Amino acid sequence: MRIAKLIGRLSVFVCVLAGLAAGVVAYFGIDDGKPSVCFGGVVGGHLANGKRLPLSGPNFSAYHIAGYLTGRTFMHGLARDAVVDAYKALQQSAPEQRYVYAEAGWPFGGPFPPHRSHSNGTSVDFMVPLRSDRGAMVQVPASVFNKLGYNAKFDDEGRGANGLRIDFEAIAQHLLALDKAARGRGIKINRVIFEPSLQRHLFAAASGQALPQRVTFMDRAAWVRHDQHYHVDFAIPCK
């Protein structure tokens, strides 16, 4: 009986602590209308006046409600606006597509475990669009049991579990729209990190053939495999 009570009290304490932590993040993430200012680089930097990505829209959604509520989807305002603008453009050019964005950063930037970067508000991850073996649009399965989708695995041909495969054409359309949207905001994409073995499939897609001339890709493997998501760094002047 005592052990059961102790476990119950501990559970309540953990829930309260988690709620307080989420409240603190939400407080610092309140949009006061001031422009964002980034400091330093994607590693070791920080951010003032971060702006939160919308939870969802007509053709996009956040990767998981837990990540959204705990404040892991904040960016520099110009980058956030470019991301949203790209989704709006894709509503017209590719109305059938659905996209999922993933982690960006804290409202105030700084260290963002388990990521090595994402510290100054200029970085964001996007989950790869998928197709089922019947051609239906599917999103990367995300739950607390697979690191909110980051533990999903795809081979060098873009094939995953249960007959799922990466939709490279949808990725190419998104990156071209994001490049155009960023330029429209007076910024640009600095680089894209996507698993090197998958880049050849991306560039072979109908819309992907234009990507190498428009967007810079990191040509070596990152410290973790980027197969279930692609990482985008924006070039924004920082202090």
Indicate where each model-derived feature is located.
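Membrane-interface motif at the C-terminal end of an N-terminal transmembrane signal
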Residues: 17-35
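Catalytic cores and adjacent binding grooves of peptidoglycan-active enzymes
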Residues: 28, 134-239
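Extended, low-complexity, intrinsically disordered C-terminal regulatory tails
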Residues: 82-113, 191-217
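Extracytoplasmic
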Residues: 94-96, 119-123, 187, 227-229
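N-terminal Sec-pathway targeting helices
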Residues: 1-17
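Active-site acidic/histidine clusters and adjacent loop/turn architecture
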Residues: 36-101, 167-177, 181-183, 188-189
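Short, conserved acidic/polar surface loops in the N-terminal third of protein domains
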Residues: 110-115, 136-140
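Short, surface-exposed glycine/acidic/tryptophan-bearing loops
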Residues: 115-129
